[in-house]
Each structure stands twice: as C-alpha cells, then as structure tokens.
C-alpha cells in the first residue's frame, strides 16, 4: 500500500458537518484495510483566491495509507460532494511523524489569541 496526503477544503456553511465527513472518509479508508496516520483539522482559514465567491473555507488534512481502489473511491466521493470545494491528493514516500507545519502555525495562532484574551481579562 502507498502513503498519501489528502487535503480538502469544505464550504464554510458546512463547517459543522466536517466531523461527520471526516468520520465517513476515515471509515472508507480503514474499511478497506487502509490506515489513517494523521488527521488534522486546520479550521476555517482565508483562501488564497475566491472560490465560488467565497473568501474563507474549512481545511482538513489527512495522511493515509491505502490501495489505488480505495483512493479512487475517496476521490469519487470528494468530486460528488457539493460541500467539498477543492481537494488535493499527493503521494508521499512514508507516513508522517508529528504535526505538520500548518498545524503548528494554527496552534501558535490559537495560543496567541488565548494569551491576548488572558491579558485583556487581567487588565480589567
């Protein structure tokens, strides 16, 4: 089986449906003897360019190990899901270890917001 990094962008109005979508895609991969090595929800982020007149969307990254038939079925489900604006599948040499660079920046951003809120509460 081969390793892949899958990133998909979900319509911002469907953000509350993301956990169910991720669960469905995980079960699709694991149900056919695949494995999900890393799953990261990057949250709602600014798009590089407008897609369908939207400037923000919900990003999800999955690192999986599966066969070609499973990957084809996963891409088919992305293509026919109207909530998925874009998706990208990249073949990788091995399973990743640790958090991705994007996830680290998301965590730094959240920590900065939390410290700013704590400072605002202490100032009052």
UniProtKB/Swiss-Prot annotation:
The keyword RNA-binding applies. SUPFAM superfamilies: Ribosomal protein S6. GO terms for cellular component: cytosolic small ribosomal subunit. GO terms for biological process: translation. Transmembrane segments: none annotated. GO terms for molecular function: small ribosomal subunit rRNA binding; structural constituent of ribosome. The keyword Transport does not apply. It holds the Pfam family Ribosomal_S6. Keywords: Ribonucleoprotein, Ribosomal protein, RNA-binding, rRNA-binding. Signal peptide: none annotated. Belongs to the bacterial ribosomal protein bS6 family. Binds together with bS18 to 16S ribosomal RNA. This is Small ribosomal subunit protein bS6. It comes from Bordetella avium (strain 197N).
């Amino acid at each position: 089986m081969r390793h892949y990094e899958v990133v998909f962008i979900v319509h911002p109005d469907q953000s509350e449906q993301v956990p169910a979508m991720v669960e469905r895609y995980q079960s699709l991969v694991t149900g056919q003897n695949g494995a999900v090595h890393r799953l990261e929800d990057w949250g709602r982020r600014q798009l590089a360019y407008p897609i369908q007149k939207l400037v923000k969307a919900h990003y999800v990254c999955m690192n999986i190990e599966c066969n070609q038939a499973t990957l084809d079925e996963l891409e088919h489900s992305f293509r026919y899901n109207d909530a998925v604006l874009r998706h990208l599948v990249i073949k990788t040499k091995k399973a990743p270890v640790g958090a991705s660079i994007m996830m680290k920046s998301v965590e730094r951003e959240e920590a900065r917001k939390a410290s700013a809120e704590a400072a605002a509460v202490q100032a009052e």
